[in-house]
Amino acid sequence: MHPIKLCARSPRPSSKKRKRPAAAAATPPESEPEPVHNTAACNSEGENNATGKRREHNNKKMKEEKSKRKKKQGEGKKGSGILTDKLFSDLPISDLTANAIRDMNYTHLTEIQARSIPPLMLGSDVMASAKTGSGKTLAFLIPAIELLCRLRFSPRNGTGVIVLCPTRELAIQTHNVAKELMRYHSQTLGYVIGGIDLRGEAEQLAKGINVLVATPGRLLDHMQKTKSFKYECLKCLIIDEADRILEQNFEEQMKQIFKLLPRQGRQTVLFSATQTEKVEDFAKLTFGSKEERQRTLVYVGVDDHESKATVEGLKQGYCVIPSERRFLVLYAFLKKALSEKTKVMVFFSSCNSVKFHAQLLNFIQIECYDIHGQLKQHQRTSTFFKFHKAEHGILLCTNVAARGLDIPDVDYIVQYDPPDETKDYIHRVGRTARGDNGKGSAILFLLPKELQLLIHLKAANISVSEYVFRQELVPKLQPYLHYDSSFEQEKIVGGNYILNRSAKEAYKSYLLAYKSHSMKDIFAIHQLDLTSVAASFCFSEPPKVNLDLESSASKHRKKRNVNTGRRHGIGPSNPYGRKGSDDRRQFARF
């Protein structure tokens, strides 16, 4: 197989043109006369020319932006990609919602929207699944908003619709989509998520939030603690990314939420990207017995007969890279991506790994954003919106950004650390090639001993090609990253206390994540070459770490509390101490 020069590949197909920089678009031709800075001396002809040029430039810019929006939303391309030939204008919805959809530049429904909106409008319980980026958010929001509009819901009625999301970022994104849909409606909208002041949210709930977007833990907190939270008139409960909610150990919280919520007269909706056994079990809890579900539940499975688990516009590949060269390959790839002004998301297995690589890359002038679970909520939200608005850039993240987030124009998904399960792979790569005719590429980094993962991907209808990096593309950066005693000068990581400490924490977290991987037959920690792994974290030799997963600070404290907490072991049951109990010669009893 001939080596593929992957990082030199064009980030987008030639048919998809990137918008020219504003500075280049506004550059005047050489024949244009010098501008007159004294406005009082300008004649009418010069003013008209300048005004005409500005108007022409503004019109051109508006046309470019409109063309970009049309291309993104697939306007005028009925029946292509994921869109159908059905129009939003044909739906039996209010003029208020129709006008909002028109403002959002949507014209044609996607498959999941065309199949799920009609039964939802009729009030049926729906359990739906579709690939990521297929338009599920609009599919459940439009009927829910229309329901409250028909009932003339007002703040005094309390909460009529609850949308549950697994992550804070997805909740904020869903809230923003609902805000656009409800711009002409009188109903109120809000969200409650972790990381934000509980008292401030309680004050908003007391005023009455008709459509509430929430994460399960924070919703349960308010249901149990906020007395002014009115949800007795709840008409619709929507659970988005139901499979992910169950993965994040929200199952017990969900059971408590279901006990507290009114069941009679409530429509229940489950949306997910994959159908798993846990989702089926969750459906039993949500919709009742099998007989009851068969009688009342409408199941919409858009991808049930699809031969591929991912979208058509996605190019997928993997690279077999030894541990010691992983960071060097990533560095070369990201440096090329920056020069080509592409948008890249890189997934890691732990928060500490994201923190270290973000610090290191920014230190060596590869600017990047980072999102992980250890950041405060305002930092996560700010970073998400910065990357969302950016035309190009790099985002390092954990699986917290792998589900539901709709970030426009992502060119590459790099899975630096392999996913824990095949469905995690699907959701990670789902951040690119979104929408109708979306294009993107996904690259998976694998060690030589991890190639059996491809068998699991193939069993899940995921087809990936092998990419080979040419060695000359990888910079000779390794000697300058770790501290080498053979040199008399400090290196980047070895000589920087913060980077060195961060690298140790990332190294330990990587090994812990590897040890807890669900596919232990493939990801076996005892097969790792720790020296090579340490080299990928910029160490010349493996740092000493404790890999006992069962150990914790509390357990150590409990051990120390034995015999009244004294290390010498002296206590009521053993007055002679730890040594004295085994050595009769040390103490004599009289």
Swiss-Prot record:
Catalyzed chemical reaction(s): ATP + H2O = ADP + phosphate + H(+)
**GO CC aspect terms:** nucleolus
Q: Which Gene3D superfamilies match?
A: P-loop containing nucleotide triphosphate hydrolases
Q: Where is the composition biased (Basic residues)?
A: 554-569
Do you know which SUPFAM superfamilies this protein is assigned to? P-loop containing nucleoside triphosphate hydrolases
Q: Which Pfam families match?
A: CTE_SPB4 (PF13959), DEAD (PF00270), Helicase_C (PF00271)
- Disulphide-bridged cysteine pairs: none
Q: Where is this motif: DEAD box?
A: 240-243
According to the UniProt entry, what is the EC number of this protein?
Answer: 3.6.4.13
- Give me the stretches of Polar residues compositional bias: 40-51
Q: What does the UniProt keyword field contain? A: ATP-binding, Helicase, Hydrolase, Nucleotide-binding, RNA-binding
| Residues binding ATP | A130, K131, T132, G133, S134, G135, K136, T137
The record ties this protein, via PROSITE patterns, to:
DEAD_ATP_HELICASE (PS00039), HELICASE_ATP_BIND_1 (PS51192), HELICASE_CTER (PS51194), Q_MOTIF (PS51195)
Q: Return the broad EC class.
A: hydrolase
- Stretches of Basic and acidic residues bias are at 59-78, 579-590
Q: Where is the Helicase C-terminal domain?
A: 329-481
Where is the segment annotated Disordered? 1-81, 549-590
- In the record, what terms sit under GO molecular function? ATP binding; ATP hydrolysis activity; RNA binding; RNA helicase activity
**Any GO BP annotation:** maturation of LSU-rRNA from tricistronic rRNA transcript (SSU-rRNA, 5.8S rRNA, LSU-rRNA)
Residue interval(s) of motif Q motif: 86-114
The Helicase ATP-binding domain extends over 117-293
Which InterPro entries does this UniProt record tie to the protein?
DDX18/Has1_DEADc, DEAD/DEAH_box_helicase_dom, Helicase_ATP-bd, Helicase_C-like, P-loop_NTPase, RNA-helicase_DEAD-box_CS, RNA_helicase_DEAD_Q_motif, SPB4-like_CTE
Share the domain note from the entry. Answer: The Q motif is unique to and characteristic of the DEAD box family of RNA helicases and controls ATP binding and hydrolysis.
Similarity annotation: Belongs to the DEAD box helicase family. DDX18/HAS1 subfamily.
Q: This chain belongs to which protein, by name?
A: Putative DEAD-box ATP-dependent RNA helicase 51
Q: Which organism is it from?
A: Oryza sativa subsp. japonica (Rice)
